[in-house]
């Protein structure tokens, strides 16, 4: 029997988006508690998966992403808001989309030795699983634009 595995950093990215989403939903509930709850969930394998499917996350990558987002949250929100088109209202941005953008932009700009194209592809894949079609294109577009503006890709 083969065991399906997903890259530990990919799982850490998903978990970081979950943590930020939960933080927004719970009105800025203590981030440390949210991180501990999410880590406990992943460690206890309480996520409903097929028997031959294993997931584990890079704890260090998860913690680094979440902490970096909180250290840079005002700057991240400013970057997001500055990249919205006139028809997009930052106040009405879906919570999950904002959480995903905060984490992805943070990794892209502040805390990654991973090539920008890999980061963009990873978060576009995550968006594909979590968001609607229009939002997926928006995530890909905004990350690509931010990477180009910051000389992360040519």
Curated annotation (Swiss-Prot):
Ribonucleoprotein as UniProt keyword: no
Highest taxon of the lineage: Bacteria
GO molecular function: RNA binding
Keyword RNA-binding included in the entry's annotation: yes
Gene Ontology terms: cellular component: cytosol
Protein purpose: Involved in transcription antitermination. Required for transcription of ribosomal RNA (rRNA) genes. Binds specifically to the boxA antiterminator sequence of the ribosomal RNA (rrn) operons.
Protein name: Transcription antitermination protein NusB
Gene: nusB
